[in-house]
Design a protein with these regions (language model features):
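Charged, compositionally biased boundary regions
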Residues: 1-180
Length: 180
């Protein structure tokens, strides 16, 4: 049964993740409505889909987090190889001062996320806004707190939005931003 669910999630997210990555690589700031809405539903139902989008933003390189890696994480988030990959990527992004962001790629993703949130309502807005908050915080953008607050207005229990808001308030930042 578990493999059937993982396969169904892979099949469902393959085209939306592929468009997402293609748009990041090509600096296209808006997704098709169908795929945008599918990602909003996926993020609302599976936080691993949200985490895959975050990975694609903070990695800064399509060779690190391609569509296959995103599908692996979203469909099998507890697989040890996926846990290790996510941990290593996030650890490097936070703690390696030489791990600089691909600013244009990240801004492109934030723009797509904002557009996604505008296409849906209620609980389906929360995670796109939260990922936009996270990406904005990671870049050092003043928009981070606004995105986090918008997400929290919709769901006051959204843990990641609360973490982003707290990080902004405490002036916490990734290592690369400490160098600047």
């Amino acid at each position: 049964m578990e493999r059937g669910i993982a396969k169904a999630n892979r099949d469902w997210l393959d085209a939306p993740f592929d468009e997402w990555n293609g748009n990041l690589d090509g600096r296209v700031h808006r997704m098709s409505q169908e795929h945008a809405q599918e990602l909003c539903v996926a993020m609302a139902d599976m936080l691993s889909a949200r985490d895959a989008l975050i990975m694609s933003l903070v990695s800064g390189a399509p060779t690190v987090v391609d569509t296959k890696a995103m599908l692996d994480l979203a469909s099998s988030p507890h697989d040890p190889a996926n846990v290790i990959h996510l941990y290593r990527l996030l650890d490097r992004a936070f703690n390696d001062a030489d791990c600089l962001p691909d600013r244009e790629r990240c801004v492109c993703g934030i723009d797509m996320l904002e557009s996604m949130a505008d296409q849906v309502s209620g609980r389906f807005e929360v995670q796109p806004l939260t990922v936009a908050a996270y990406g904005s915080w990671w870049l050092g953008s003043d928009d981070a707190l606004d995105y986090a607050k918008r997400a929290l207005e919709l769901d006051s229990q959204c843990t990641l939005a609360r973490i982003v808001a707290s990080a902004v308030a405490q002036e916490l930042r990734p290592a690369w931003r400490l160098k600047c």
